[in-house]
């Protein structure tokens, strides 16, 4: 699996904000999850929380335009204690709050570290956006981009910064492929052509192995962060 931190492009995997808090302690690793509306970002966040919460101290920041719907879903599912889940209401296009003006998200992350820290990991979920959505290097250290087979098997071929430069591309809802006519082999080939050595995971949260491959990728990131 590709875990090279020395990328030369200016995409999301370039070096981000200072790795230390003002008091000199090491801050949490921050991983952003972006992708189109309905691709399964929140369900993936929930599954990751369940997979990682026993081994790591983690928290979540969600983004919605005018509501707290994603955060409320995570709270209902009890994936983490309530104080470890917070919501940002962006009031504008989702990419604005994760790339152009990150102040609200950065404050939310820092408040979580102050209030429930020390934390190993903060997951920052973007509101649903298009294929161009990327996170600011000042907000997250790595980005996962989630698409789904119901959006069409041409999505990887269409590219866009989210697809081509995210540190991990997740093709979600693979169990639906036979019902929507999506060719997983074609999607895999197109993703490889767009992303070269950057990793791609095909995922169904309804069938084994579920979120396990993505959770393993996150664990590897955490190990590298702590090294």
UniProtKB/Swiss-Prot annotation:
Keywords: Chaperone, Cytoplasm, GTP-binding, Nickel insertion, Nucleotide-binding. GO terms for molecular function: GTP binding; GTPase activity; nickel cation binding. InterPro entries: CobW/HypB/UreG_nucleotide-bd, P-loop_NTPase, UreG. Belongs to the SIMIBI class G3E GTPase family. UreG subfamily. Its main location: cytoplasm. It comes from Streptomyces avermitilis (strain ATCC 31267 / DSM 46492 / JCM 5070 / NBRC 14893 / NCIMB 12804 / NRRL 8165 / MA-4680). It is found in: Cytoplasm. Residues 1-10 have a biased composition (Basic and acidic residues). Coiled coil: none annotated. Residues 1-22 are annotated as: Disordered. GTP binds at residues 35-42. Gene3D superfamilies: P-loop containing nucleotide triphosphate hydrolases. The keyword GTP-binding applies. The keyword Ubl conjugation does not apply. This is Urease accessory protein UreG. Facilitates the functional incorporation of the urease nickel metallocenter. This process requires GTP hydrolysis, probably effectuated by UreG. GO terms for biological process: urea catabolic process. Homodimer. UreD, UreF and UreG form a complex that acts as a GTP-hydrolysis-dependent molecular chaperone, activating the urease apoprotein by helping to assemble the nickel containing metallocenter of UreC. The UreE protein probably delivers the nickel. GO terms for cellular component: cytoplasm.
